[in-house]
UniProtKB/Swiss-Prot annotation:
UniProt entry tagged with the keyword Nuclease: no
Family: Belongs to the universal ribosomal protein uL5 family.
Listed name of the protein: Large ribosomal subunit protein uL5
Keywords annotated in UniProt: Ribonucleoprotein, Ribosomal protein, RNA-binding, rRNA-binding, tRNA-binding
SUPFAM superfamilies: RL5-like
Gene Ontology molecular function: rRNA binding; structural constituent of ribosome; tRNA binding
Gene Ontology BP, a term: translation
C-alpha cells in the first residue's frame, strides 16, 4: 500500500475527525481524484508538438493522457472546432496517491525560489488548483530531451464541503502552503 494512503487512513482521518467533529469516518473528507491538464497552443500549427507533450505527461503521471479538442472555432487563434489543443490525465486510486506523494515530497521542492503554494487557489467547494510553470520539476523528465518548457494545471478534487476542511486535509497530506 502507498505510504500516503497509509498515512491518511492511520493518522489523518482521526485528526480531522477530532478537529471538525465528524459523526462518522465516512464523513471525513478524502482526495477523490487529481486531474493533470496540459494546454498546448502550439499544436494548432504543428501536430508533432502534441505527441511530445503527451509522451511527457505519460512519463510524469504513469497513465496515458486523453487528447483534448477545441470546443469551438476561434478565428483569432486560427483554431477550428475539433482540433487537438491539449492533453489531460485523470488519476484516481493508487496512482493518484503515488502522484501526490511525488508532487509534495520531490517535485514542488525542486521549483526555483519556492516559498510554498498559494492558499487562495481553493474554489469554494473544497477543490484545489495548482499551476506548474515547467515540467522539468518532475524527476521523470530528462532535461536534455526537452524541446520546449511547458506548464500544466493540477486540480486536486476532494470530498470536503468547505475550503477550510480541504486546506486542513492537504496540509496534513504534506502540501507546503505559504506562511
Amino acid at each position: 500500500m502507498n505510504r500516503l494512503k497509509e498515512k491518511y487512513q492511520n493518522e489523518i482521518v482521526s485528526s480531522l475527525t477530532e478537529k471538525f467533529n465528524y459523526p462518522s469516518v465516512m464523513a471525513v473528507p478524502k482526495i477523490e481524484k487529481i486531474v493533470v491538464n496540459m494546454g498546448i497552443g502550439d499544436a494548432v500549427q504543428n501536430a508533432k508538438v502534441l505527441d511530445k507533450a503527451v509522451e511527457e505527461l505519460q512519463a510524469i503521471t504513469g497513465q496515458k493522457p486523453v487528447i483534448t479538442k477545441a470546443k469551438k472555432s476561434i478565428a483569432g487563434f486560427k483554431l477550428r472546432e475539433g482540433m487537438p489543443i491539449g492533453a489531460k490525465v485523470t488519476l484516481r486510486g493508487e496512482r493518484m496517491y503515488d502522484f501526490l506523494d511525488k508532487l509534495v515530497s520531490v517535485s514542488l521542492p525542486r521549483v526555483r525560489d519556492f516559498r510554498g503554494v498559494s492558499k487562495k487557489a481553493f474554489d469554494g467547494r473544497g477543490n484545489y488548483t495548482l499551476g506548474v510553470r515547467e515540467q522539468l520539476i518532475f524527476p521523470e523528465i530528462d532535461y536534455d530531451k526537452v524541446d520546449k518548457v511547458r506548464g500544466m494545471d493540477i486540480v486536486i478534487v476532494t470530498t470536503a464541503k468547505t475550503d477550510e476542511e480541504a486546506r486542513e486535509l492537504l496540509t496534513q497530506v504534506g502540501m507546503p502552503f505559504q506562511k
